[in-house]
A protein has these predicted regions:
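Short, low-complexity intrinsically disordered segments enriched in A/P/G/S/L with frequent Arg
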Residues: 6-9, 19
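SAM-dependent nucleic-acid methyltransferase catalytic core
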Residues: 13-18, 22-54, 61, 65, ...
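SAM cofactor-binding core of SAM-dependent methyltransferases
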Residues: 68-133
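Short, polar loop motifs at secondary-structure junctions
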Residues: 74-79, 189, 270-274
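Short, glycine/acidic-enriched loop or turn micro-motifs at the edges of active sites
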Residues: 75, 96, 210, 227, ...
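Short loop/helix-cap segments at secondary-structure boundaries that form the rim of catalytic
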Residues: 81-85, 213-215, 276-282
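Conserved acidic-Pro-Pro-aromatic motif
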Residues: 218-304, 308
Length: 314
């Protein structure tokens, strides 16, 4: 169910902006110099609900100063991972299509770029590509490259970049009618591919609890689960079948208690609901504000109140 990537190269890396490594590949964060990635082209390749670009500064300010292994069980668009670019990482997402995209970027980026260049920005073509997953047998026969290309294309051309599937797991976001969507973005794809292949990054597709069992003592875990809804209509878990309700939130809290008992530091983001604040009452809970750009309702995009929860000091 998972794929392991190559070993990281052992070498000393000089300080680069707010990030540097020592000769043991321990990521050292100098929070006083702000956030600066080693390669600015290593950025998210897909737009994802709950993406953390708008919250990066708040997250980075609260990271522990030394990180030997970075773990992210709810990867999504990977904004935090790609900003930090750790040498040793364990990353995971329950969305199989999303993890396939990362595997193909790592293993076959040039063939992926060639496939993306063939796509058309028309409504008729969009729906023909979108509906490929209606025939389950035919969809399974598609190559990994074509399936990854399809997901990126749909993400770049669907309405507001909202990756959404129905109860049958079929992509159902409508066409976005964008004039010039950046479907290919080859420079970013190549940069992300280089990052994934040059470092010890492990890609997983499994339940978050299974991944967290593999995290070694002394590691750092960033948790960005589907958020607890602030109202009865606010929940969005359409990027995966099944959803993520209160029972899942409680199961995640139990995992966080287990991490703490094992000496693993974690930082968790979620919505600022009374349920979440009470659930994590024994931890450091801080309120922050983030701007949300992906929402099917345009009136609900904008600044929202969230919480960052951690089990370690500043």
């Amino acid at each position: 169910p998972h794929i392991k990537i190559c070993r990281t190269r052992q070498k000393t890396i000089a300080k680069l902006g707010g990030l540097c490594y020592n000769n043991k590949n321990i990521l050292i964060l100098d929070r006083g110099e702000g956030l600066m990635a080693k390669n600015k082209l290593v950025t998210p390749v897909v737009k994802w609900v709950g993406g953390k670009r708008q919250l990066l500064e708040e997250i980075t300010q609260r990271l522990p100063k030394r990180v030997t292994t970075y773990c992210e069980p709810f990867l999504g668009g990977g904004a935090v991972l790609f900003s930090l670019q750790p040498k040793n990482a364990i990353v995971n997402d329950l969305n199989a299509d999303l993890m396939l995209v990362y595997e193909v970027i790592r293993d076959n980026v040039e063939l992926l770029i060639a496939s993306l260049e063939k796509h058309e920005n028309t409504s008729e073509y969009f729906y023909s590509i979108r509906d490929l997953d209606r025939d389950k047998d035919a969809y399974r026969e598609m190559s990994a490259i074509d399936r990854a290309s399809r997901i990126i294309y749909l993400n770049k051309t669907c309405y507001n970049g909202l990756f959404r599937v129905n109860s049958s797991g079929e992509f159902n976001s409508p066409f976005g009618y964008y004039k010039n969507p950046n479907i290919v973005n080859a420079s970013v794809l190549r940069a992300v591919s280089k990052y994934l292949t040059a470092n010890h990054v492990q890609l997983f597709h499994m339940d978050f609890e299974e991944v967290l069992r593999q995290v070694p003592r002394g590691a750092f875990v960033y948790l960005d689960p589907p958020y607890d809804p602030v109202s009865d209509t606010a929940s969005f878990t359409g990027y995966n079948r099944g959803g993520f309700g209160r029972e899942e939130q409680e199961r995640l809290k139990h995992c966080c208690d287990g991490l703490t008992a094992r000496g693993v530091r974690f930082l968790l983001s979620n919505s600022s609901t009374l349920f979440i604040q009470n659930l994590y009452a024994g931890y450091t809970v801080e309120t922050v504000h983030a701007k949300r750009a992906v929402n099917s309702d345009a009136s609900k995009r904008g600044a929202v109140e969230e919480v960052l929860i951690r089990n370690y000091g500043t």
